[in-house]
Amino acid sequence: MVDRVSDDDFWSFKISEKSAGKECINLGSYNYLGFAESDGECTNKALEAVRQHGLAYCSPRQELGTSRIHQELESTVAEFLGVQDAITVGMGFATNTLNLPMIISKGCLVISDELNHASIILGLRLSGATVAVFKHNNVEHLEKVLRSNIVKGHPRSGRPWKKVFIVVEGVYSMEGSIVRLPEIIAIKKRYGAYLYLDEAHSVGAMGPRGRGIVDYYNLNPMDVDILMGTFTKSFGAAGGYIAGSSALIQYLRLRSQAFVYPSAMSAPVAQQVITSMKSIMYGKGILRVAQLARNSKYFRQRLQQMGFIIYGHDDSPVIPLLLFMPAKIRAFVLECLRHNVATVGVGFPATKMTEERARFCMSAGHTKEMIDEALDIIDRVGDYLNIKYSKRKLFHGKTIQY
């Protein structure tokens, strides 16, 4: 970590000249499975890809940018997810923002979770569709909003909607909550809607086989019409994918602005995803999935035992710690950093004004010694800043098993 300083009340930042950098326990990055490492099989294969294919293709996929490695990547993603086909693009944010307007258009109705990611919100705005929002992860309210809008029809003409979509995430990045997917699939089938599932924070990190939320609930992946995910979290790379039926993917290959116009994903990035994904399917990567689950549960339960208010699902690798007051975000992050623990503070507009928080992201690369050291520091910082707000300490007097 290096220190940043500001001379204009935090309108801009620069790296401090006195900062030499220091080693920290990283609790802020999305390196869920620890594949973003400087050595090992993934790194070696990525370096080999550079020697064979170079650093960049300097051409869009529809011109001269498609190579064998891209075809292998897309077939690997489809196999990993258990669907017919997949399309990959070079930027995770654009996977939502530029593909949603190609799938959803004017005259369509979208029922969207109120805490969906900014990339989804922007993509839906660009689509021109009518968007109705339901309370976070509340399937009863989802069905109420869906039924009401179907009955009313288009607000201007009263005519039936062209198509109806439900858009949700697998794991919500600020809440650590997990989508109630079985119930949403049941609603989708009942009303004849299409389901768009963003698995950016769940693919690789959730489920006994690391296949995401669909795997976590042991559901049929074909019950989800459009599967979206990114390679920037669990796979330690860049870019994202849309997966589903062959007809959908063939359509996107012809129409998607995220596929047609940008330069193709570089070979080492594509190879990083292939190697890490195949490691989960056929190698020792599955052990990382189990390690992440163990680390996440242990870290969450220890924080609850200390008296912190923790949001999210017990199985989620995203662990928000409530700070509530804006001033305590900076104090908490800097105090942790002073003791060599790097974390992320989150405030408005990413969260409500009254729900400021620190967000921890666990990794399979964390050892128990690292986690215990970080927990000891967080415990002391919590006492120092008086942020142990919970009125009941869970697991009081018990030994949390690792």
Q: Language-model features: where?
A:
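Active-site C-terminal subdomain of aminotransferase-like
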Residues: 191-194, 201, 206-306, 311-315, ...
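Conserved PLP-anchoring active-site segment centered on the Schiff-base-forming lysine
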Residues: 99-118
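N-terminal "arm"/small-domain region of PLP-dependent enzymes with the aminotransferase-like
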Residues: 1-55, 193
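Active-site phosphate-binding strand-loop segment of PLP-dependent enzymes
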Residues: 30, 132, 136-197
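Eukaryotic N-terminal low-complexity, Ser/Thr- and Lys/Arg-rich leader segments
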Residues: 1-12, 151-159, 384-402
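Conserved N-terminal alpha-helix of the aminotransferase class I/II PLP-enzyme fold
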Residues: 43-92
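Conserved PLP-binding catalytic core of the aspartate aminotransferase-like
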Residues: 1-5, 286-300, 304-340, 348-350, ...
